[in-house]
């Protein structure tokens, strides 16, 4: 086990720093708040191996999936952002803001991810799709968190995510700072 101490601040910064330290074929984003089921990891790994898939995104909105942590505001926001992601970027995933993700490490590093905040949630799949990588969703069951508090401000972070999506749509280099 390697323990990393985050150098800068921000959700996206922590994830990017972690991905950049991974030396295995695949990486996985797995929250420490107890809301993810580790039993779903094998399913995600099998999808990567069996389907020539590059990234598997856990989804709380597929048949056989659920969320015990969503509020009506986060549900509506996520559905809206997932719709935007699928309509404008043809992502083909059903839960864009849920960062239970497993994917090809080198391909993730090649994306040159920049988002230091929650915009990371949309930057990863959008840049992956723009690079021609294959994305799929896998049913996931989100449990109530056992530790920690949500740091997401639905409206402030939602606006920031929307701005990030607009930048990713209009700017070819997709630079997000």
Regions found by a protein language model. Name each.
Residues 56, 95-97, 137, 174-177:
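Short, hydrophobic secondary-structure boundary micro-motifs
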Residues 122:
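DNA-recognition element of transcription regulators
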Residues 1-4:
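Acidic donor-binding segment of Leloir-type glycosyltransferases
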Residues 92, 116, 125-143:
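Catalytic donor-sugar/metal-binding loop of nucleotide-sugar-dependent glycosyltransferases
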Residues 34-36:
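Acidic metal-phosphate-binding loop of nucleotide-sugar-dependent transferases
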Residues 163-177:
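C-terminal, non-catalytic tails of nucleotide-sugar-dependent glycosyltransferases
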Residues 7-21, 26-29, 38-118, 144-162, ...:
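Acceptor/aglycone-binding surface of glycosyltransferases and processive sugar-polymer synthases
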Residues 30-31, 139:
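Short beta-strand segments
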